[in-house]
Amino acid sequence: MAESLAEIYNKRVLLFDNDKQGNISRLFDLYNGDIVPGACVALKSRVLVPGTIQKTAIPGVDLVNSNYFMELAENEIRADQESPQHDRYKAALAAVAGEYDYCIVDNPPDLGINVINAIVATDEVIIPVNLDGYSLDGLEELAAQVKNIRALNPKVRIAGCLVTDFEKSDYAEAAEIWLRTKSGLHVYSQHIRHYKKAKDATIAKKTITKFCIRSGAAQDYKKFMAEYMKGGK
């Protein structure tokens, strides 16, 4: 999304890696496991100090990186029962909001303090969904949690579900029909097809659209962004 927003729609984008695995940070070769990352600084101190926002190789896209120090930061926040725990990213991002058109937060699947902070700070949530039983079960739980967090952030909404890694089969098609008709959530028309060389793209440290622009998945992502932007974003 960040790449398309910057290159096609000329938007200024802040990418926020909120996953301790740091996959987005690794993609842009900005992962450093030896220092406290920008996401950790924001979670602990409620600010993005100079140096915590880094330039990526994509003009118009900056990054707040992450690593396994995030786990230590979360434990520290949990232990602090005197200070508010859920408004930390909101305060940090508010200070730089004028510099960007979009902030995209990449979250892990678990709903820890860092993810709650991200939802409190955001306007909308896009849920990527694989069409398997575990993902669909987790989807219902996540949707319920987002609704609960509205007590802390009344503006937040689930913008929609994006079907990813799609491989055609009777079971997958049945699951997609259920998702679109029975889940009660908006599902984007465009789904993202499975790309067998996706792992190769991560090794090359390139986005799928840069690694193989002609692949079905790359074209699907561009079509999804067009659909998303038509929604008035």
Region locations from a protein language model:
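P-loop NTP-binding core
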Residues: 1-233
